[in-house]
Every structure is written in structure tokens, then in C-alpha cells.
Amino acid sequence: MPTLDLDLALATARRAVEAASGAALAHFRRGVRVDLKPDRTPVTIADRESEAAILAVVRAAFPDHAVLGEETGAHAGAAASRWIVDPLDGTRGFTRGEALWGPLVALEHEGEVVAGAMALPVAGEVYFAARGRGAWLSTSSAAPAPLRVSGVPRWEDATLQLGEPSVLLAPPFAAPVERLATACARTRCYGDLAGFAMVLTGRAEAWIEAGVKIWDLAPMKVLLEEAGGRFTDLAGVPTVASGDCLASNGLLHDHVLAALAPVASRP
């Protein structure tokens, strides 16, 4: 089996989210029509064109790789490598003209995500990482700079970011999340990938998310670990496939896991 070119994978992930960003920005705040998928989640031409842009970049670099896309489903390919794609995380906000949305792209090789990227297009920010290559932030005004999580060691000094409030502020999550939120310095709910970006850039210490799909989380583990943080599901398993997650600076991870233990068990 050929060895994976990890540097090419990293460059491809970065180019893919940059291409998707351009495709989506062409429709941003222009009154796009919103359709509903069978699961009642929204989709627009921006989602579809962003996924097409990502697939074009991926196939040009790795034509034999499999792909799992939120909008187009599974595309067969080499068994050892699969790209996981969310072309526009935060579609609801996008349709309302909010700025905190963006694409997520990850490469899973032999069962482990080894490279990934995400972007906040309105801010002109691109985040990218590969195993052993570090995590980086590129902006429209500066060369790529290394990412590093915060060094805040005490929960009373921490900032907590929350994901989907309709899940996290409802039973069974509401009680433990409220205890965490009232014991830290401040709590914010920026939504979608933006809350995670706060942890990745050292502006928050923890981000909790639940009720999501693998493509909503796929690149985050490698991004955060390469920035010195820790990423697990709410049961403490280092995976992006459980549908929930805790992303942290590492220093406070076990504290948050312990608080969430009553709701972290699985059938």
C-alpha cells in the first residue's frame, strides 16, 4: 500500500476549505433559497457549491481516496483513506446573515484523522493541522502562525464555550452544564465551529458539543491536539465519531469530564 503523503494531505485540506470559503462567500447575505433535507435540516446552493469545490480539490490531489460528504454522501475509494466533509457548518446562521460559519475538512487514514482544516470565511481565518506538523492559523493579513491553547489551570478563571443550546440546555445535559457554567469566569455560546475556534486559539478553555454528526467534528481532534489541547467525547474516549465532544486546553479536561459523567454513559 502506498505511503500517505501527509504534507500533500495538509496542503489539500487547506486548499479545500479555502475553495469552499470562496464558493460560500459568493452567496453570503444574498437571499439564498433554503431547502429542507429529509432530516429537516436546511441546505442551500452555498452548501452544495462549497461541497463541490472541496471535492474538486480533493480529487485533484487524491483521486483514489474515499469521501464522506454531508450533502453528497459516501463516495467509494481506497479503503485506507477517507475525506470527511462538512461544506458549511452553521447553515442556519449563514441564511440569517450571521458571520460564524465555515467549512470543515478532514482526512482519515487507517481509522485515524491525520490532517484537517476549517475556516471562518467572513473573518478571513483558515485553521489547518496534520499529525506531527503542528496546528496553524492563516489570516487574510498575515502569514501562517502556530496555534497554541491557553495555559489557564483553574476552572474559576476559565471561559466555557457551549455548542448547540437546544441540546445542552435541555435534560439531561442542563443540570451539569449549568453547574459548570456558573462556576467558571464566563460562558459563551458562539455556535458551530466558532466556539471550538476559541479554544483552539487560546481564547477559551473548554467547548462542549452534543447531538452532531461526524462531519461536524472531524478535523477538530487533530487540530486541537497539535495545538497542545485535548479532544474526546463526553465519555472521555478520543474520537470524533460519537456525536458529542469536549475540546479543552488539556489542563481542565478531567474536571469537565467529571462534571459531565452523569450524562456521558452510552447504551
Which role fits each region the language model picked out?
Residues 1-88, 252-258, 265-267:
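N-terminal subdomain of lithium-sensitive/metallo-dependent phosphomonoesterases centered on the IMPase/IPPase/PAP
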Residues 48, 52, 71, 87-90, ...:
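Generic detector of well-ordered alpha-helical packing
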Residues 148-267:
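An extended, acidic
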